[in-house]
């Protein structure tokens, strides 16, 4: 899993509440167990018209936001069914951070397992970030995970809270398997060293 240290890039605003996982990645894209290629289906019911053409009004189709790395979204993002394809689709599109006032618990946990930083902020701070993100190409946010800060385009800084375990895993690029290996590495090394001393074993 890619480490998350500092992320600098355009933030796309989505002033919509209760965006569920079916809107993030519709069910027709769930047939695969690969984590790649899902970016094309991200928000597809909003991104594309019935004839398959792009909806020019959707934020991620607008030139300023096509390469957004952060989403600033409405309350209760990621509600609905517990499909891990939702963070897979976000990551495949290039989204590394999502900021809201609240997330569905399962989606929130799945983000961390897939290298995406989900940040919870107050309604007042979210409104500031929406206003920053609505600047288009100038909507650059810098997220420093170690310092737990979000710096806006004018240099204003917001602080956010995060569980220390989740922070450690993201900073070090550890998913569940990586975390297990990281914790057990000394014991594994000791066992292998012991075996090396017993050439007859």
Curated annotation (Swiss-Prot):
Principal EC category: lyase
Keywords: Amino-acid biosynthesis, Branched-chain amino acid biosynthesis, Leucine biosynthesis, Lyase
E.C. number(s) listed in UniProt: 4.2.1.33
InterPro entries xrefs: 3-IsopropMal_deHydase_ssu, Aconitase/3IPM_dehydase_swvl, AconitaseA/IPMdHydase_ssu_swvl, IPMI_Swivel, LeuD
GO CC entries: 3-isopropylmalate dehydratase complex
Metabolic or biological pathway: Amino-acid biosynthesis; L-leucine biosynthesis; L-leucine from 3-methyl-2-oxobutanoate: step 2/4
Secretion signal, residue range per the UniProt entry: none
GO molecular function, one term: 3-isopropylmalate dehydratase activity
Biological processes annotated in GO: L-leucine biosynthetic process
Gene3D superfamilies per UniProt: Aconitase, domain 4
Reaction equation(s) it catalyzes: (2R,3S)-3-isopropylmalate = (2S)-2-isopropylmalate
Function, in words: Catalyzes the isomerization between 2-isopropylmalate and 3-isopropylmalate, via the formation of 2-isopropylmaleate.
Subunit structure comment from the entry: Heterodimer of LeuC and LeuD.
UniProt record similarity statement: Belongs to the LeuD family. LeuD type 1 subfamily.
PANTHER family registered for this protein in UniProt: 3-ISOPROPYLMALATE DEHYDRATASE SMALL SUBUNIT, 3-ISOPROPYLMALATE DEHYDRATASE SMALL SUBUNIT 2-RELATED-RELATED
Full protein name: 3-isopropylmalate dehydratase small subunit
Protein species of origin: Methylorubrum extorquens (strain PA1)
Gene name of the encoded protein: leuD
């Amino acid at each position: 899993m890619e480490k998350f240290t500092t992320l600098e890039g355009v933030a796309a605003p989505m002033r919509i509440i209760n965006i569920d996982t079916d809107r993030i990645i519709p069910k027709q894209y769930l047939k695969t167990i690969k984590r790649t290629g899902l970016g094309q289906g991200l928000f597809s019911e909003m991104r594309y018209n019935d004839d398959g053409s792009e909806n020019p009004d959707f934020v991620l189709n607008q030139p300023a936001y096509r390469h957004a790395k952060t989403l600033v979204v409405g309350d209760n993002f990621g509600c609905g069914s517990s499909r891990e394809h939702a963070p897979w689709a976000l990551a495949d599109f290039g989204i590394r951070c999502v900021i809201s006032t609240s997330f569905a618990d399962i989606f929130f946990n799945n983000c961390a397992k897939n290298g995406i930083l989900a940040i919870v902020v107050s309604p007042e701070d979210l409104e500031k970030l929406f206003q920053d993100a609505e600047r288009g190409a100038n909507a650059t946010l810098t997220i420093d995970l170690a310092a737990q800060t979000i710096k806006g385009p004018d240099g204003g800084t917001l602080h956010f809270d995060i569980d220390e375990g989740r922070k450690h895993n993201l900073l070090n690029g550890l998913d569940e398997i990586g975390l297990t290996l990281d914790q057990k590495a000394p014991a594994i090394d000791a066992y292998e060293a012991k075996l090396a001393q017993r050439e007859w074993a």
